[in-house]
From Swiss-Prot:
Name of the protein this chain belongs to: Protein FLX-like 2
GO CC annotations on file: nuclear body
Coiled-coil regions listed: 83-236
Renumbered residue ranges of the record's region Disordered: 1-27, 303-359
Superkingdom classification of source: Eukaryota
The UniProt record lists the keyword Coiled coil: yes
Biased composition (Basic residues): 1-16
Transmembrane segments: none
UniProt keyword terms in alphabetical order: Coiled coil, Developmental protein, Differentiation, Flowering
The organism of origin for this protein: Arabidopsis thaliana (Mouse-ear cress)
Secretion signal span: none
Amino acid sequence: MESKGRIHPSHHHMRRPLPGPGGCIAHPETFGNHGAIPPSAAQGVYPSFNMLPPPEVMEQKFVAQHGELQRLAIENQRLGGTHGSLRQELAAAQHEIQMLHAQIGSMKSEREQRMMGLAEKVAKMETELQKSEAVKLEMQQARAEARSLVVAREELMSKVHQLTQELQKSRSDVQQIPALMSELENLRQEYQQCRATYDYEKKFYNDHLESLQAMEKNYMTMAREVEKLQAQLMNNANSDRRAGGPYGNNINAEIDASGHQSGNGYYEDAFGPQGYIPQPVAGNATGPNSVVGAAQYPYQGVTQPGYFPQRPGYNFPRGPPGSYDPTTRLPTGPYGAPFPPGPSNNTPYAGTHGNPSRR
């Protein structure tokens, strides 16, 4: 770069004159291994002509030097072209630098103007910010109120959901009201029917209880009379055995075979032939009765409550044949419907159906 613009000396000026007469060049190959010039040559004492190299060698050296000089010239030309292009690039770069300096100045001025405008805006915004402190407080209060309103809205939505569910349940209940009313009316009618049935059965039970009490009294009187007749029959039988009449053996055999006494009883016309009544046991002639009270019984079977001996022509709970039939008094029940079956007449009056305390 520093040598650019200078004129380089040509290779003709760079040649050195040949020392000594004749202008011959002393080649270093002829002077030892290191190429040093001998001191005799340095002192101006030149070798003889016989010591000079041959002309072919000199010509080859000249050709080599000429090629080197041409190469250097070509390189110099290339360097000159490169130097010119670099000078052009330098001029363009300097022009660009000048333009950049101008742009930087304009940008600095614009930046200063912008900064001044921004400073003015910041000052205005600071004044407005100071004025907007009250607005900020109001905004905070409004946000708090909005949050509270959102919470209240959520609560109201949950309440509305609950009320909607309750309304749906109420609607379903309201839809069931006609069925419930009809069921209530049916239950009311059934209650009235059951009440009428209960009153009717109660009246029937009271009448039946009174008839049973009267039959019990009659039975007690009959039992006493049967006891008397039994005693008389036993006395007659004993007297016949003692007498040993002609028909005593046949009578006793008939009694033993059938288990019944021959002859007609006192109540045979009304109740049929009486069954065999065992002899009363001493100390066991009384038995409790839950309806009538304590009464005298002539035989052991009636000492237990609810015990009634089977007889061919008389049923104690039902009474004598044709005397009393409670079913004839109940053709129909309440409202014209068939009356439900009552307690069995074969059940003792002191049993489950005949006990007033269990009703």
